[in-house]
Amino acid sequence: MRHLPLFMCTAFCGLYSSQTEAADKKNERPNILWLTFEDTSAYEFGCYGNGDVHTPNADSLAARGIQFMNAWSVAPQSSAARSSLITGCYSSTYGMDIHPVPYDTPADIFFPQRLREAGYYCTNNSKTHYNSTTDNKSCWDECNNKASYNSTKRGKDQPFFAVYNTVTSHMGRIRTFHTDGRRDYTQEGIFPQQLTLPSYVPDLPEVRSDYAGHLEAVQDVDTWLGIFLKDLETRGLEDNTIIFFFSDHGGCVARGKGYLYESGLKVPMIAYFPPKWRHLANGAKGKENGLVNFTDLGPTVLSLAGVKPPKNMQGKALYGKFASKEKREVQFALAANQLHHFMPVRAVTDGRFKYIRSYIPYRQFALRNYYQWGMPSNKAWDKLVLGGHNTNPDWKQTFEPHPAEMLFDLEKDPDELHDLSAIPEYAETLYKMRQALSDHIRTTHDLGFFLPNSRTGHILYEKVRKEKYPLDELYGLVEIAGTATVASLPMLEKAIASPLPVMRFWGVVGYANLARENQINTCPQALLALLQDENPYIASEAAYAVVYLGKAQEGIARLITPAQEKDRKIGYSSLECLSLDPEMRDYIRPFLSELKEAAENLPRLENEDAGLMARGILVNLGEMDIKDLHGPEAYKKGLKLNYGRRAMVPLPN
């Protein structure tokens, strides 16, 4: 494919200087275009080393622009990631981390409004997905499927900030429940049997098919990029438009989206500065190995527009008038939940080493997000492990409880399979990473440890400040809970007696961790009493704990029959966790009739339905085949998706 004039590089410094001076004299400001796509890891593009895919437009853009080699999304799920993009802050600071649930937040935290006040015309076509009840469209001049930088409402010389998001690579493209009727990807130059699979996924036909289908989507994204580059050229905008091209988080190969591994966090990100505006990036070009994350993009856009980023923004401007001179030493990421499974996890990296902290470590990573488990590869992986056919310990890791702390050497172990946290020679690195994360959750006032049902009816960000909430005490408890020892019992005993629900919950997590690890074997009466706690999250977590303390009948009965029907899914979350433990399955079997009734009679067509969760538990118990998880209704839907192909939209109107 020929290179478009947009990418022509000047060979003369004099021309570069004259263009810079001309821009300064006219007091011009650049247009800024974000072209975003979904669910795609960095390794899925040719310019990031993938030889199985054809991405000429992105490869060309990377060669002529700035290719970020260590760019992280803040979160491995869409809404939490986009909440960070739009605010320039970690989404946990505003309690916007739970996917995909909007909560009340301060109303003035979306940065495009500042651009509008500075004279920019701001458009979004059209996905928002910010986890805020504030009108997501309020910060844009236009926010719909017709919004365009070509709008007749934009002034003749008015600079624009335009965002286009395509869903062509979204997981929904391969969330087809089965592979029957799938297109022949070899017609697109993608050969499933020749693909190089990541070592953390099993080599199964469904895994290869899903990966091939997603690489087809990546090629479509590349074509979509080319359409915009041509439009900018045709309209004479290429010389005045800075482009950012990136994914919202990692991709659709299993153990990617939703997980704080590199496969879920490291995104392809390319920035292109036309010669006229290259001085704003200090002439930078080529591969950038520094650490970058989504909190940096909002401040960067403001800085490029000549607007000083507000002090409350936690990211750093990479380029422009207010570019930060500080080098980022470490960067952070977060995950809050897998659908109904509340399981906060945090991560930090210095580029070489990666630390993942699971605050409820007995919650397996394989707990199902029932949307993601519509991918045939996830179903096939479940069948391999749960059916007892797996012989590779690496492929079983996500099905088991994991250490509260994990440490990986990304240089030697890019697939993050070999945990170094227990190896003495890495003790100093482990300590440094642990301390960096501990400091981070405190300096950012991380609200992600508050229960989902405690975030409604108020603006949590303001409530904790107004009431001088004991956040430091909470963080200390949270850190102890996942690594509790018998020496922690006095703190845990105090916590479960607290009038504050969040303290009771994390106290229970500490007891559950001790019980799961066989560090205690008798059930305290105060813990047993929490089966009747008015907060269903506390009652369900207590029920999980007492099952391991000789009270299986009482605990499982509480999980099977909630105090209120609306809380059933919370109990099923803990029950699913138990059902992945082979030693606990016989304790659940006396309740099979109740589970089968729920699986048959409760709603099961939507990802959040309790009937679907009941079916998942039955699968774990060996009482249902994984292929029947979503029911017969899903088969026809899958056929239609396998025959079809997502459109490359939106386009520059």
Spans of model-derived segments:
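Formylglycine-dependent sulfatase
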Residues: R2, M8, F12-G14, S18-N390, ...
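Long, internal low-complexity/basic segments
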Residues: A23-P30, F37, A42, Q67, ...
